[in-house]
């Protein structure tokens, strides 16, 4: 959901909402890149105070963290070169492809469950680069990220997304016992009621995926 702009600043729906939440708390936000596969360890080890970047609310995540209410609907989608899109319109057609997936992601879980060949990489953006370079045949990433980064008018105009593999919800995770969960849920309700959440979603093309906050 997030990426760096030309000035090296983190932007995106999650990043902008996190900045707003930090402002409400009266603190400075710091964005730390982590190994997504180790996100629970990073959180428990206090490398970070929360996990907030398109995190799927899986049973494993909800058991390991105190999580916010869901704020976005999402799905995992298959990314392929646009010129080959017609060949890959069903799950069955994906057999034999070599996939790039973010390690520890919902995308990796989906590809593994289907018994498809995959190579874990550090980030979803790296998975896109693998396909663009021809190192991998396809990738599986979040549909919200795909909408922002793939296709006409993006840096990956020669790629497109085809098959949707599942549906899921995004949430924010904090360490067990954190009082920030209630604070964030309240912030989501306020931002949704004020329309600022929708404005932010419009900016990054994810308005249709927003979950009503109440």
Regions found by a protein language model. Name each.
Residues 26-28, 45-53, 97, 132-145, ...:
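Alpha-to-beta junction loops
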Residues 15-16, 30-43, 86, 103-105, ...:
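Short helix-initiation/N-cap motifs at beta->coil->alpha
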Residues 16-24, 82, 103-105, 169-208:
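Extended ligand-binding regions for polar small-molecule ligands
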